[in-house]
Amino acid sequence: MSEIGVVKGFKVFNPDWTCKNKQYGCPGRFEEDVTPSVCNEGMHFCKRASDCFNYYSFDPNNKVAEVIAYGEVSEEGDKCATNKLEVVRETRGLNCLAL
């Protein structure tokens, strides 16, 4: 499924705010000139923070951030991909797992 709209979610980053060789920042807006496709193209995120750990091992040094997708969004199961992503703020502690 692919749609255009505003979708809120969560994304996991390495301690230096990188993910898959791409540098992010918090806060920040990022765009890719791609048609998003889960597991293929775009910046990936999950609507629920706890779902992120289906794809990443829990590491207390990693960053978990609230994100908003503004562009096209592809969704498959509990994972989404977009071509326009805003990193809003870091979510600290284990409280994010309840989100």
Question: What is the meaning of each model-derived region?
Answer:
Residues 1-99:
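Short, glycine-biased loop/turn motifs at secondary-structure junctions and
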